[in-house]
C-alpha cells in the first residue's frame, strides 16, 4: 500500500474560515498526474471569493501534462540558505526531497501569498509520519500555557458534528483544543487508527495560541 496517491487542493477565504476542497491532484496507475476541480465545492467557494488556480482557469476541464511541475513551483527552492531548517521542521525524508508529489504532501505547498494548500489522503502504514496544523483554533482562544511542545495528544471521532461527518477532535488530556484538518482526518477513520500517535511539534502564540503543528505517526 502506498502512503498516498491523491492530494486534495484546499482553499479558504482566510484564517478562521472553512476550508473548501476545490480539486484533486491524482497520481494515476500509468504514472501520470491529473488535476481535476470539484465543481460543487468550487461553486460554494466562489460565494466567498474563490478564483481558479491561475494556470488552470477552466474548472470543467481535467488537466494533465505539466500539472505537477506547475504545482511544484510552490515548493521551497533547494538553493535557499534556510532550506535545511525547512526540511528538518517538516521532517522530510532526504530520499524524497526531489519528489514534488511527496514534497507537496508533506509541506502542504503552503505559501504566504495565497490560501491554497495540498492535503494528502494518507493510508495507515507502519512508519507513516507527517505534520498537520490543528484546525478551529480561532474558536478556542487557547491561553499560551494550554499546551507545550512535546505534549502527547489524543483524538476522538466527532460523531455529532453536523457540518463534517469525518470530523476528528483533538484533546490535551481532557481539554479539547482543536480538530484535525479536512482530508487528513480521513486517516483516523481507517483500520489501524489505534496505532496513531499525536505529538505537538511547534506552537505559534502571541497572547493566545495562533497555530499548533502536530506530528501524526504510527
Protein language model regions, located:
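Conserved active-site motif detector
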Residues: 1-218
